[in-house]
Amino acid sequence: MVEKTIEIKQGQVLSDILPNKEIPTNTILNKTLTGCGATYGEIVHAKRHSIIIEPNVPVILGKKAEHPSLFAVYEGITKEDVKAFLAGEEDGFRKIITTPEGFDKKVLPAMYETHTPMYDDYFLLLDECEKTIQDVGYRGDIYLPVEDFFRFKNKAMVSATPILPSD
């Protein structure tokens, strides 16, 4: 694993300093600070289709309120809703935000059924990635996206408190 340190000055956000304003692919981003714009940059600046996985619905609802074009998947949103979004007119880059469970039960099946080449065409951002390990004991399905994570050509994990991989 190659480590690279990037300093953010007061008043800056990640998209101010990252190349092309995007989180690089195949990255574990240890941002050390919350609220420095990792998901904001992916939603607003990244010129690519994105699936953002958040561990909790309140975060998803907050992001949706800030960014109305973001397609939010949570309880009450169905696989058919996801398919309709994917079949709809595309005006720019598609941005989907979902829980781990929504990814597995709604987003993945909708992508398969619409023959959307998600592993090649979408960037997968696993936000608060430490929650996958911390919460799996009582929330077994939180781990499901990890099985698909490495199938994506373009992907990253983000956390202010990551649990780094070890041998």
Where are these regions (language model features)?
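Pre-Walker A (Motif I) flank of P-loop NTPase domains
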Residues: 22-30, 48-49, 94, 154
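Conserved H-loop
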Residues: 55, 127-130, 159-162
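Helicase motor interdomain insertion/brace
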Residues: 32-39, 140-143, 159
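SF2 helicase catalytic motif II
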Residues: 100-103, 111-156
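Inter-Walker segment of RecA-like/P-loop motor cores
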Residues: 68-113
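Pre-Walker A adenine-sensing motif
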Residues: 1-24
